[in-house]
C-alpha cells in the first residue's frame, strides 16, 4: 500500500481484475515488467530483444545488428527508463508507457512495429512496417495516444523476401 513490494511464498490467486492504468504523465508505465542486463546504452521507449549473450539490445528489423530480430529472437518489449551499458534495465513486456520526448507523434489506434532503423539515434516503435528485402516484420503494440503506447508484442515474425 505504501509503494513497497510484497512477496508471496506460494501461489497467488486473484479473484478480481488486475487494473493497468494509463497516465498522461511523462515516463509513467503500468503492466508486466522484467529486469534484464543491457548490452548497450538504452533510452526509455526503445524496443529490445534478447541477444544470444543473454543481454537486451535495441531491436531492429533490418536483420544485421546485435539486436536484430528474427523468428528465433523476436523483440520482447520496450525499455521504461534510460539505462547505461551493462546495467539493470526494466523492460515492459506488456502494458502502457507514456513518453513525450522519445516517442514521435503517433496516430491513435495505429499498429506499431519493430523499427527498420533508428530514428534520431532511438529505436522506438514505428508506424510503418519494414518493407525492404531481408527485413523482418513484428508488431510490438498499438498507439493509444499521440505519445502513449500499449506494448503487446506479437511473437510472429515475418521475413520480407
Per-region residue spans from a language model:
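Beta-strand-rich receptor-binding modules of extracellular spikes/adhesins
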Residues: 1-14
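Glycine-anchored, exposed beta-strand/edge motif detector
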Residues: 16-161
